[in-house]
């Protein structure tokens, strides 16, 4: 796919990667992905939104160059500095040293460490605007969606919102637009998985952002990955709100006890601990032998639990993999504040 004019003077210049199957080591991408980039041309200015992953540099530069010479781009809006968004900034600055980078102060500090050179910059404050001929760019600082440096850009006259990772997916579609997606089941599967991995740990921040997005007049949402939303925007916003609203399904305080037991001793400890907690009254206790239990179900239970105890024997002085796997899936933003401890047997 080449470039696509989304609105008069506003173009998609991203790259598609149908063959990608693993992203950032931990995410599986059965539908590939896209590295979305956009160009806005006004009467006297050119704005580039995002760059592309370094491996796509040459083809991406060719696309941008077909709209405007690289050395005539005035502004680069960096919504977020993760390398899949900013991996080509260094090369872009070599080709266009006069380029002004527009980003949050946090993002500019990160970029200085990434490119190791000076550059012109505009450190955006929340609510700040940039007037460019007949276009107004409004900036919304939205930290932790999903990095602390993130912002959205609203192109007021075009009713377009550029949202970085929010509302995106690892889903490569040749038609670029959400209205061109024929496999809706696959698209929403990829969208939910992307949300769970990228945005899910920051649900409260997403809800804050949604409150600010809903009042906007929107005809298009342009994410950093996946199809451009030219249809179904209210449904996407409602779905994100539903996914981000945490409703604890537990009617009373709940303690989860995941454990593994090589010879039964740690299992006996788990049973005794569970009985002791139960005898206190008023607390639900759920035991899971992680050799047999569904790890995904247990991970979800841990999210809503008030407390948890991890049980494991030691082999060569170490806790065992099923328990380590649970701990690496926890994050202070979602699991912080819970009562927790560990137990086990050794010898």
Residue ranges of predicted features:
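Conserved beta-strand hairpin/beta-sheet module of binuclear metal-dependent hydrolase folds
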Residues: 3-65, 152-155, 159-163, 266
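Metallo-beta-lactamase
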Residues: 4-8, 46, 102-223, 229-231
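Active-site neighborhood of phospho(di)ester-bond hydrolases with catalytic His/Asp-centered motifs
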Residues: 49-51, 73-81, 101-104, 161-164, ...
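Active-site metal-binding motif and surrounding structural segment of the metallo-beta-lactamase
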Residues: 55-102
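Terminal amphipathic helices with adjacent charged low-complexity linkers/tails
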Residues: 218-252
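Short helix-loop-beta junction
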Residues: 268-286, 304
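Helix-loop-strand module that forms the ligand-binding subsite of alpha/beta enzymes
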Residues: 294-347
């Amino acid at each position: 796919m080449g470039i696509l004019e989304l609105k008069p003077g506003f173009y998609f210049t991203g790259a598609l990667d149908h063959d990608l199957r693993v992203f950032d080591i931990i995410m599986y991408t059965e539908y590939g992905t896209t590295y979305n980039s956009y160009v806005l041309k006004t009467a006297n200015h050119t704005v580039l939104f995002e760059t592309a992953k370094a491996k796509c540099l040459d083809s991406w530069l060719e696309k941008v160059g077909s709209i405007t010479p690289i050395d005539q781009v005035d502004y680069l809006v960096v919504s977020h500095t993760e390398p899949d968004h900013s991996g080509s900034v260094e090369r872009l600055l070599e080709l266009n040293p006069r380029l002004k980078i527009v980003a949050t102060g946090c993002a500019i500090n990160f970029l200085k460490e990434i490119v190791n050179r000076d550059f012109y910059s505009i450190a955006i404050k929340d609510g700040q605007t940039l007037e460019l001929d007949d276009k107004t760019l409004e900036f919304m600082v939205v930290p932790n969606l999903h990095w602390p440096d993130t912002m959205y850009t609203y192109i007021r006259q075009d009713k377009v919102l550029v949202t970085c990772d929010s509302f995106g997916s690892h889903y490569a579609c040749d038609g670029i637009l959400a209205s061109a997606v024929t496999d809706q089941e696959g698209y929403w599967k990829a969208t939910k998985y992307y949300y769970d991995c990228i945005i899910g740990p920051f649900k409260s921040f997403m809800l804050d952002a949604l409150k600010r997005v809903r009042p906007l007049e929107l005809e298009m949402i342009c994410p950093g990955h996946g199809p451009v939303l030219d249809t179904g925007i209210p449904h996407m916003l409602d779905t994100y709100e539903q996914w981000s609203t945490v409703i604890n399904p537990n009617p009373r305080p709940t303690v989860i006890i995941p454990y593994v037991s090589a010879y039964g001793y740690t299992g006996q400890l788990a049973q005794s601990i569970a009985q002791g907690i139960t005898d206190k009254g008023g607390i639900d206790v759920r035991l899971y032998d992680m050799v047999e239990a569904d790890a995904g179900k247990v991970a979800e239970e841990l999210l809503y639990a008030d407390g948890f105890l991890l049980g494991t024997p030691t082999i060569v002085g170490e806790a065992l993999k099923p328990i380590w796997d649970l701990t690496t899936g926890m994050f202070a933003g979602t699991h912080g504040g819970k009562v927790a401890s560990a137990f086990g047997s050794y010898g």
